């Protein structure tokens, strides 16, 4: 799929202000993403989600993240994530490759 190192740079530039990835990492404006893959929307323990996130009911995997990261507010109307999204498919693939590794270590 994507390039992990390029994905890490994208995460630092576009995501790290609001999210952490390491096990036991703290929630910021957005939830800690450790254990993201295979988890349902709105389920990170200790984070307060909107009903829209809790009720979406999808499981995070490569395909759902590809769609979500392109336009979060379109994929989950009512989400409090203010990020506009990543339009370039290759950048989303790189970010997902990084997240797959970093949220599972």
From Swiss-Prot:
Modification note: Binds 1 heme c group covalently per subunit.
The keyword Cytoplasm is annotated on this UniProt entry: no
Protein keywords: Acetylation, Apoptosis, Electron transport, Heme, Iron, Metal-binding, Mitochondrion, Phosphoprotein, Respiratory chain, Transport
UniProt xrefs under SUPFAM superfamilies: Cytochrome c
Positions of post-translational N-acetylglycine modification: 2
Subcellular location: Mitochondrion intermembrane space
Gene3D superfamilies on file: Cytochrome c-like domain
Binding site for heme c: 15, 18-19, 81
GO cellular component assignments: cytochrome complex; cytosol; mitochondrial intermembrane space
Signal peptide location: none
Gene Ontology terms for molecular function: electron transfer activity; heme binding; identical protein binding; lipid binding; metal ion binding
Modified residues (N6-succinyllysine): 56, 73
GO-annotated biological processes: apoptotic signaling pathway; cytochrome c-heme linkage; mitochondrial electron transport, cytochrome c to oxygen; mitochondrial electron transport, ubiquinol to cytochrome c
Modified residues annotated as N6-acetyllysine in this record: 73, 100
Record PTM Phosphotyrosine, positions in chain: 49, 98
Disulphide bond pairs: none
Family statement drawn from the similarity comment of this UniProt entry: Belongs to the cytochrome c family.
PANTHER family: CYTOCHROME C (PTHR11961)
Record's miscellaneous remark: Mules and hinnies are heterozygous, having equal amount of horse and donkey cytochromes c.
Free-text function comment from the UniProt entry: Electron carrier protein. The oxidized form of the cytochrome c heme group can accept an electron from the heme group of the cytochrome c1 subunit of cytochrome reductase. Cytochrome c then transfers this electron to the cytochrome oxidase complex, the final protein carrier in the mitochondrial electron-transport chain. Plays a role in apoptosis. Suppression of the anti-apoptotic members or activation of the pro-apoptotic members of the Bcl-2 family leads to altered mitochondrial membrane permeability resulting in release of cytochrome c into the cytosol. Binding of cytochrome c to Apaf-1 triggers the activation of caspase-9, which then accelerates apoptosis by activating other caspases.
Protein name per its UniProtKB record: Cytochrome c
Gene symbol of the encoding locus: CYCS
């Amino acid at each position: 799929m994507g390039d992990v190192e390029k994905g890490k740079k994208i995460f630092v530039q576009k995501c790290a202000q609001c999210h952490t990835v390491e096990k036991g990492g703290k929630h910021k404006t957005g939830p800690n993403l450790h254990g993201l893959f295979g988890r349902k929307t709105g389920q990170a323990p200790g984070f307060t989600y909107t009903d829209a996130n809790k009720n979406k009911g999808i499981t995070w995997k490569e395909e759902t993240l590809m769609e979500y990261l392109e336009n979060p507010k379109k994929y989950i109307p009512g989400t409090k994530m203010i990020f506009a999204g990543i339009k370039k498919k290759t950048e989303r693939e790189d970010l997902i490759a990084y997240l797959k590794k970093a949220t599972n270590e």
